[in-house]
A protein has these predicted regions:
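Glycine-rich, low-complexity segments
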Residues: 2-35
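Terminal beta-strand-rich extracellular "head" domains
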Residues: 31, 36-42, 52-61, 65-127, ...
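Short intrinsically disordered, low-complexity coil segments enriched in acidic
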Residues: 1, 24-25, 152-157
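Generic alpha-helical hydrophobic packing signal
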Residues: 9-10, 50-52
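Short, solvent-exposed loop/turn segments enriched in Ser/Thr/Gly
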Residues: 45-48
C-alpha cells in the first residue's frame, strides 16, 4: 500500500483500519503565554489553556498533560481538569483537596514547577473541550500566580 502526503495536509492511502493499535491520530495543544493571577476561592478558567478534540472512535483515549510555574505565598493553589462542564481526573481517595493537581507552598515564596497528566476516554465521537481551572484555598495571602512570581509580575513561563 502506498501512502502519499500532500502539501495541503491530506494523506492518501492511509485510513483508520490500516493503522496499528496505539497509533496517534489527532494532536492538539494549548500554550499559556504570560501570567495570570486570582484571589478566587471558586474555580476560574485559566485563559488560553483549553483544547477541543474530536475522538475518532468511542474507545479513543485522550492524553492530557500540562506543566506550569505556580506561586502561592501561603497555603495551597488548587487546579482541576474539565471535559466540557464535567470535572475529570478525580483521584479515588477521599478527604482533603481531591483534584488533578495541588501546590502547597507552606509559606515558602517562590515559583514552583507543577505538572500533571491524565488519559481520558469520553466514550463517544463528539467534540470535547478540555480546560484547566484554578482557585486558591484562601490563606493569609490568597493570590495564586501562574507563569509569574508573588513579588514580581515578570513571566517565568
Amino acid at each position: 500500500m502506498s501512502i502519499t502526503f500532500h502539501p495541503d495536509g491530506r494523506i492518501d492511502g492511509l485510513n483508520r483500519s490500516s493503522m496499528p493499535t496505539g497509533s496517534l491520530i489527532n494532536f492538539v495543544s494549548a500554550k499559556k503565554l504570560g501570567t495570570q493571577s486570582t484571589d478566587s476561592t471558586t474555580f476560574i478558567d485559566i485563559t488560553d489553556l483549553s483544547c477541543t478534540i474530536t475522538p475518532t472512535t468511542s474507545n479513543s483515549k485522550i492524553y492530557i498533560a500540562g506543566s506550569m510555574n505556580v506561586n502561592k505565598e501561603n497555603y495551597t493553589a488548587i487546579f482541576r481538569l474539565m471535559r466540557d462542564s464535567t470535572e475529570i481526573a478525580l483521584p479515588s481517595g477521599t478527604g482533603g483537596v481531591n483534584h488533578i493537581m495541588t501546590v502547597y507552598t507552606a509559606n515558602n515564596n517562590g515559583a514552583w514547577r507543577a505538572t500533571f497528566q491524565w488519559d481520558d476516554t469520553p466514550g463517544d465521537t463528539n467534540p470535547h473541550t478540555y480546560k484547566l481551572q484554578m482557585r486558591t484555598d484562601g490563606g493569609s495571602d490568597p493570590t495564586v500566580h501562574i507563569g509569574g512570581h508573588h513579588d514580581n509580575s515578570s513571566s517565568y513561563s
